[in-house]
UniProtKB/Swiss-Prot annotation:
Binding site for spermidine: 62, 86, 155-158
Species annotation: Caldanaerobacter subterraneus subsp. tengcongensis (strain DSM 15242 / JCM 11007 / NBRC 100824 / MB4) (Thermoanaerobacter tengcongensis)
Protein name per Swiss-Prot or TrEMBL: Polyamine aminopropyltransferase 1
Gene coding for it: speE1
UniProt GO cellular component terms: cytosol
InterPro entries, sorted: PABS, PABS_CS, SAM-dependent_MTases_sf, Spermi_synthase, Spermidine_synt_N, Spermidine_synt_N_sf
Gene3D superfamilies: Spermidine synthase, tetramerisation domain (2.30.140.10), Vaccinia Virus protein VP39 (3.40.50.150)
Primary site of residence: cytoplasm
UniProt: S-methyl-5'-thioadenosine binding residues: 31, 106, 137-138, 162
An MF annotation (GO) of this entry: spermidine synthase activity
Keyword annotations from UniProtKB, A to Z: Cytoplasm, Polyamine biosynthesis, Spermidine biosynthesis, Transferase
Amino acid sequence: MELWFTEHQDENLRFSIKVKETLVVEKTPYQHLAILDSYQFGRVLVLDGILQTTEKDEFVYHEMIVHVPLFTHKNPKDVLIIGGGDGGSVREVLKHSSVERVVLAEIDEAVIRNSKKYLPTISSALDDPRVEIMIGDGIKYVNEHKNEFDVVIVDSTDPIGPAVGLFTSDFYRAVYECLREDGIIVAQTESPFIYGKLINKISKMFKEIYPITKAYIATVPTYPGSLWTFTMGSKKYDPEEVDINSIPRIQTKYYTPEIHKAAFVLPKFVKDIFDEV
């Protein structure tokens, strides 16, 4: 008998993968968690029925949400990651030699615990001494810390359940206060094929708060529509003005200095979504 996992990406769209084995299923205080071993994408993390990351393509998302803002900033030392309990973003942040401290604010300890056990290639850096793990509400943490971080990475789930508050103007304004005078925020902002209205709304909120707001893209095969957007707000540095020849070569599988520059060249329909008044 064949076992398949199907994600309902939209009322008219589903995505299925063939499963070898169910490794863990857990009802946490916040969500339903499952880690499955699939034939095509290796082990996959699923939260509330939505695929979050896979061993085969996770590097695209994690490299792009991290290296674009960190190489835009001139000297990132303190980095806050909100969400991201699988540890992939932490792993990528620690490839930057300037980083002295990473705070991971994850509301659900079960994500961290199960990722450490079942997703070791993704969670491999969570025990690094530079990492501080804060189990709790990332919004509350941001509101309690002012002028403390160089980069804030919003590595959230989709805008449902515990992540809803991470897609609001109040939150983005609180992050502004949490950042230092040359700080940068980057947030994953969903698929332009599915969440066009949400992307436009977020773009407007960022533009009201951050002097420099830019959008960039990457291709993540297991995410809805495969094309994924990220929105960056910066107090000082323009990511498109980075001298790509000065970006040091680090060990990556997707990100390169050339990709850094190319990611800001948006398809017209995506640019229209971000620019619509």
